[in-house]
């Protein structure tokens, strides 16, 4: 039988388009799309070495001998117990628990013999080993610093003990009395003879048992010329009323002037 020609349309389909037995592009796209999201594998206790999720929180718990860890969940309470020679790793929703017996921490040989979870055991050993080294170093530094400080303080006290009586004696004598007593033989360039010694101050009642020794040597002379110095002291100034070697002879008394005689008539 002959085929009837189709009526022309606004958008005629090309003759090389869809084949009668082949699928269309839309159906092919539907077949290539995944049927649905793949179900995620729920974490379980049977797979302790599984890779933890990104951003999961990891906690390390050290259990003493004969103790267990109780983890409260939504409906039940999970009780975790482990043998004293193994390390248990539990993965929950976004939280990873690593349980370590206390016996393994006390012996390096027992920690190295644990084969249940080698990766977790290495991480825990490195972490706890570094922490233990820090604690030991702090204790050694603290214990060593205490005797050194005590020995230094004792040495300071022994060195300072002989100096304390001298300081007390000097302070009891009084700085003013010591300075005044050292000026008993001081000479002045403007007067002849030494300066008279000033009166001594009243003794301090607290210094009766100490000897008020002067601070300076009483034989010390101030303002004495130095032999090697070109500067020499000035000669003493002449006293008023005493004729010097270069004194001028007294002038004769003159009669008062005429104006003075008129003003002051005798």
From Swiss-Prot:
It comes from the Eukaryota. Residues 255-266 have a biased composition (Basic residues). InterPro entries: PRR23 (IPR018903). Residues 227-238 have a biased composition (Pro residues). Residues 1-18 have a biased composition (Low complexity). Residues 1-47, 197-266 are annotated as: Disordered. Belongs to the PRR23 family. This is Proline-rich protein 23A. It comes from Homo sapiens.
